[in-house]
Amino acid sequence: MKSSDRAPLIRAAVLEPFIQVADRIGTPVERLLRSVRLPSERLEDAALLLPETACWHFIHSVVAKEGIPNFGLIAANAVTFPDLAELASLTHGCSNLLDVLKRFCVVAPLFTNNALFVLEGTADHVWFSQKAKPLLDDYAQIHLFQVLGMIQLVQLATGSPASMAVGWNHTDAVNVFWANPASWMAT
């Protein structure tokens, strides 16, 4: 089966930070989950596969209802390092950040079958990129969550690197955040 023939699926663990933050701010989470045809009960099984498009529709519904345009960043920031226990195991046996990133590129499709993380570079620089086409180009939350998640992975492995450049493909949905990326990266 070609990858383009597969239904895009994502683990419940990826949606959970969005649910937690939405719940904290008083969003009617269960109602919004039902409205996009996702299970309305708490997703106890982090490995449960969910339709990815429905998950992003849920997140978009929270953004529209609560008027929080950077909700994807807030949710990604809500994921603390202890919550990244599954990712922390990536660092075992790796001698450097490059090894961690290589391993992540291999295991990322276990969390979403729409992921295509790659490493490109020269002898002096490495670019860590998400090459898969976003399911919904006009949903900024997808881009914001992915970029901050990638930053957090680097921080998990290195603490705070001496330098890190951040960028993404400019689309109308995310250009509003590009003027000052430091303003949304601050924790």
Can you describe what each PLM-predicted range is?
Residues 94-187:
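Alpha-helical bundle regulatory/interaction domains
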Residues 1-127, 163, 174:
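N-terminal low-complexity or simple alpha-helical regulatory segments
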